[in-house]
Amino acid sequence: MAKNNHISASGNSTSGDHRLKEEVLTPTTSASTPHRIFSVDDDPKEIQNDIRYLEGLHEGLKFALHANKSKRSVSSQSPIVHSSNNTLHHHEHQQHLPPTLESLSSKSHSVPDLNTATPSSPKRMHSSIRELPHDDNDDEDANDDSRFIIHDSHGHDLLIDEINCQSPSHLENNDQASNASSTESFTLRERQDAINETHPFGIRIWKPALYKKHRSVQRTAAQDIHETQLKTITWEVTCSNVLWFILFGFPIAILFYSAAIVVFLLGGGGLVTNSAKEYSKCLYKLANYFLWPFGKMVYLLQDEQYLQEDKDEGISMQQFYNWVTSYSNRLVFHQSQAKFQQREDHPAPATESSSLMPPANTTATPLNSNHPSYNSIRHEIPHAAAQRRYFGRGKWSWGRVLFYTIFHLVLQPILAVLSLCLWLLVFTIPMSNVLWQIMYHCRRHPLALGFKYVENSSQSHENEITQQQLNKNILLCTFRAAGWHYYKYTVDGTNVIVVNLISIVFFTIFDFYVLKNFLHWKTWFTYESSIFILCLTSTIPLAFYIGQAVASISAQTSMGVGAVINAFFSTIVEIFLYCVALQQKKGLLVEGSMIGSILGAVLLLPGLSMCGGALNRKTQRYNPASAGVSSALLIFSMIVMFVPTVLYEIYGGYSVNCADGANDRDCTFSHPPLKFNRLFTHVIQPMSISCAIVLFCAYIIGLWFTLRTHAKMIWQLPIADPTSTAPEQQEQNSHDAPNWSRSKSTCILLMSTLLYAIIAEILVSCVDAVLEDIPSLNPKFLGLTIFALIPNTTEFLNAISFAIHGNVALSMEIGSAYALQVCLLQIPSLVIYSIFYTWNVKKSMINIRTQMFPLVFPRWDIFGAMTSVFMFTYLYAEGKSNYFKGSMLILLYIIIVVGFYFQGALSE
């Protein structure tokens, strides 16, 4: 562990500086940014080095605070000491150092200053302490004797406020002797990082960013349809372009050729009116463009009457030519002309994004100052448009009527459906955007569209642009029909694949209620087995939207509100699913789902996360004490949950079952089926209710413990120094703006919950057909595997993503948090619901195993759940993660599930 402290305290008029030099065990490879190491080998001297580091920091803090207090008694105002000041009087500062620091200070001159090291030399991580400035006129801070900020190499600041204490015993009894707080309010990104780092009990842990940020795939997607340079086409791109020509380009071209002929003939062949000839020619050009759109640019001829309306359409031809000649065979990120001009006046540093822009001495002179930015694809009419246009502009004519009649009735519906299909295919998003943009421009100004090959347009001599070319704005230009990188494309902060899966939700509902029940269609997608698969697939995006909405609300509200919303909406959908199953006498399905959820959360999910994390790091280490509340509650819930089962096993009695009544040597002992007898009515059922109440109370106590009485460390995390993070904020722009506002998150949460309830009812109604198609499949085994794992796919993806990025502790916390939700919320709710549901039903008509959830499990369920939880907590307590431990968890899950399969065979 590399530690190097730089401690400086303020003097009367000059600054003192002292650096603690220690051995760097893991030097960083960059001189500008320290590198965080997640996977390291065991070091026998690590604890001693940590103790030396903490002792040195403690002595430095004591000296700094003491020196500042004595100084404030003489001077009313303290000068600011900057950590970057290297011209300090070392001998004056050394006179006031304690012995432990003075001995090290004597050697400081012989040690080179690593803060000025070259990039080739390793740079030590260091911290600095400086005093906060005080204002003489500020009476509120008069009682603050001293305040200091600790700087570290990561750009984090930690504000230390000394609290006046009369005796040392008061400091020992006060947990808040030093109050760590932020120098500014938390941004949304820092709130999400704080939740993920502390992972408080009851708060949703979420991997995808809840804040808006610029992604490289967004810029690439914009570049793919707004190219400004000649490209070197690879064979993969050529293959996709040829497929476009065969599957889509040629049929669309035939369609537009036919439309052009119809408009030309109905318009009198240009003899009656010239407008029909113009619109027919426009359709002919569109047909040629769709046949092979690659390498062609679509430009807009500006009209003096519509200059204000068209000023935000595309980019200027002059900017196009300058970028073509300056940056051949390179993707260019198009920004607005105003930003382009601003970069010319104030050149930006050579960052990753700015390096793609033309140099500051570019001779381009922007024509318009408000061209739109292409940093993201927006399928909407620009805000600067004066009005919406659906039938073009200019004077009405017979040709215009013919064109828009055919366009709105035939051409646009076909293009819209094709654009939607290409969007759903994900990899063909470029052509989907091209079709959408073409439809937009055809509705506004079809006669002003022009088409030209890029290679022909780049032959201008020394960027000589004629006045005619100055009146053209480039709208579209693409060289590819598809791209592999589009699986990372996001829409409003959500992955495009998840967005596209929402279409399956609506199709499933339409398929079941309209096509199957109302129209009585008999096709393969109206069979109940097919609908069952569609329902399982539909739960994945709905669970994702519910999880992201809950996480977004939690990050934008208080911790208490976030905990309540997470507890309610994260479980209500699954509780509703299981309640519907109990109403349809599928109690074994519910029982298997409960046990399967626990097994998946404590065995399969951590196992996959450990193996996934081992892909990049052989070993990951974490602090197992951070999950003390979750581990304790997990073991407690397992014990309480199986108390009714233990009572039934001890006092329930047995029945003797003989294979042959005449031969008493071949007999087995088994528990009789649960019935409404005195044991169940007076012992088992009251104990089940008591356990359900105790489990729910444990969840409330856990929330109160972590979010109320012991919550002082949750938000007391260092945040980045505004001066040190300025370049990062300029590059990534705002991290304060959420992807979803609170109102939007609430609407998405309610809508997703409603859709999930509808899908759950359809899913349960199709279970019988699946069991009939697969006779060997037991309802409990179906719930143990399919119902327990498929709806939780989002949790698995989050956990594996955390582990791959070096945070396996969060992955394991996700598993334990979900297992606790099952034990402390879902199981008590099902116990209470089953009692109220059968309250007015005749007892002799109730089958307890299929219509109720009595909290009585078979012995194999107890064995599987208990061994899984103890195996999980044991491995978690070691504080290390590798693929060996992950493999053990996965193998244990497999063998327990196989045992459940044979349990069903034995029960039959």
From Swiss-Prot:
Compositional bias per record (Low complexity), positions renumbered to this chain: 73-87
GO biological process terms on file: calcium ion transmembrane transport; intracellular calcium ion homeostasis; potassium ion transport; proton transmembrane transport; sodium ion transport
Family annotation (InterPro entries): CaH_exchang, NaCa_Exmemb, NCX_ion-bd_dom_sf, YccF
Topological domain spans for side Cytoplasmic: 1-244, 430-494, 552-560, 609-626, 708-746, 805-816, 873-885
Glycosylation sites: N361
UniProt keyword list: Glycoprotein, Ion transport, Membrane, Phosphoprotein, Sodium, Sodium transport, Transmembrane, Transmembrane helix, Transport, Vacuole
UniProt key word Transmembrane: yes
Record-listed Phosphoserine modification sites: S32, S110, S121
Residue numbers on the Vacuolar membrane side: 266-408, 516-530, 582-587, 648-686, 768-783, 838-851, 907-908
Transmembrane residue ranges: 245-265, 409-429, 495-515, 531-551, 561-581, 588-608, 627-647, 687-707, 747-767, 784-804, 817-837, 852-872, 886-906
Cell compartments where the protein resides: Vacuole membrane
Keyword Glycoprotein carried by entry: yes
Pfam families documented for this protein: Na_Ca_ex, YccF
Topology term for the membrane: Multi-pass membrane protein
Biased composition (Polar residues): 1-15, 102-121
This protein's GO CC annotations: endomembrane system; endoplasmic reticulum membrane; fungal-type vacuole; fungal-type vacuole membrane; vacuole-mitochondrion membrane contact site
Signal sequence extent: none
Location of region: Disordered: 1-20, 68-147
List of residues that carry Phosphothreonine: T26, T33, T118
Organism domain of life: Eukaryota
Family, similarity comment: Belongs to the Ca(2+):cation antiporter (CaCA) (TC 2.A.19) family.
Function: Has a role in promoting intracellular monovalent cation sequestration via the exchange of monovalent cations and especially Na(+) for hydrogen ions across the vacuolar membrane.
Record-given protein name: Low affinity vacuolar monovalent cation/H(+) antiporter
Species: Saccharomyces cerevisiae (strain ATCC 204508 / S288c) (Baker's yeast)
